[in-house]
Amino acid sequence: MGYISDNTGYNISDKNPNYCELTALYWAWKNLECEYIGLCHYRRCFGHTVYSKDVEKKKSAIFSKVDYENLLTKYEVILPKTRNYYIETVRSQYEHAHFKKDLDETEKIIAEKYPGYSDAFTKVMNQRKLHILNMFVMKKSLFDKYCTWLFDILFELEKRTDLTSYETYEARLFGFISERLFNVWLERQNLKKCEVPVVFLENIDWPKRVCQEFCVNRFNKQHRIAA
């Protein structure tokens, strides 16, 4: 189909169980030369609002090249609409769904290596909304700056983290942390941002999803909830 694997060129493909889509992000950073770059998923794409469960109708709602070009004439970065946690903060949601110590260690690393971002980290952690999924479109020059910052923090966190006791889900640690870090990085940038819908090509049982999140938040009952 013409796809290039992320195990070519300069890569961290072997880290995929822990870094998730970030192995593709790293590959693009190190191997591509282009004006603009973005990240979507095989089942999650930027697009127009669509209410149908029909997969073909969902596919037709996915942004075209023209849609992206029109937005990028007015904005510096395209982002997914924020997820609203409503009843808790970004920090408490992470602590309920994942391991608190990993977020705490990330905060320490930022204070040590990028103290100018500490206030942004605190602000994002105290908010109730978050851009998730690591999805975006921006200029490659801006993307390079983001990746330099992001992977410096994540590689340091990896050095300080023993993953031997982590189950498969929690071993995706660096993917989860990166979603929060992306918002921290954005908080420090003075960018013209555009939030757009995400087209989910799979059918999600939203009532069940909401119930699961409520159980985690209200009763501290663990579920396998991404992000």
What function would you assign to each model-found segment?
Residues 1-227:
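ER/Golgi luminal nucleotide-sugar-dependent glycosyltransferases, focusing on the catalytic module
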